[in-house]
């Protein structure tokens, strides 16, 4: 597995923060690093396989990666990321207690993926741009300024994450997308889902199309197919079992949709004919 080292990304040995844009981020094999990072998805879509679990990521997704986590990107489509790198929560010169603002693992569950709405994403970009402008300066005031900006970024993300902000339709849509990640295999009635998240069906369609470029059903089908592709690569379950586990009641229909989406059959993926990078 590839290991990325801080010496190749941080501008100096005492820099606590570094900005690493990926515009775009291509498919990238599984790796880990000796630093931590906050991955901010600007726009586009892709699959982020994090510690073996696939997540669909789109504009507004924020992922917190620790130095012992392993992850990869696949099936990227114009996926643009900004990575905010930091050595460790306790390696800042002017800040202490940052762990309290970061996601915490509880009972083996780590809430690594958050979502923010478009207006918050704009504020995030402004903070990151300010940090980036100061990267070449190593004097104490500049270091303190970068660390203060990093603290502001953490506060903004925490206050604006879907866990703490459900006041507008954009935030409720983000919660809906997170719900689909956990319930993609369920039979989905869009009228009922819209009601569940206090959205009109028209608003759900419009905002989901704006955020992902797909209609709700098309997004759900792609999510199911991506989960199925991951299982084909990383499990021994039969194609039929995988189809059912991912929400398809007809394995033939599943195979047709799968080939249409990926230009490969499920059997091709199982046999590694697509040349996927391990």
Swiss-Prot record:
Residues 191-212, 239-262 bind DNA. Transmembrane segments: none annotated. The record marks 241, 250 as: Interaction with sigma-70. GO terms for biological process: positive regulation of DNA-templated transcription; rhamnose metabolic process. InterPro entries: AraC-bd, AraC_XylS_family_regulators, Homeodomain-like_sf, HTH-like, HTH_AraC, HTH_AraC-typ_CS, RhaR_RhaS-like_N, RmlC-like_jellyroll. Pfam families: AraC_binding, HTH_18. GO terms for molecular function: DNA-binding transcription factor activity; sequence-specific DNA binding. It is found in: Cytoplasm. Residues 174-272 form the HTH araC/xylS-type domain. The keyword tRNA-binding does not apply. HAMAP family: HTH_type_RhaS. Binds DNA as a dimer. NCBIfam families: PRK13503.1 (NF010028). Activates expression of the rhaBAD and rhaT operons. This is HTH-type transcriptional activator RhaS.
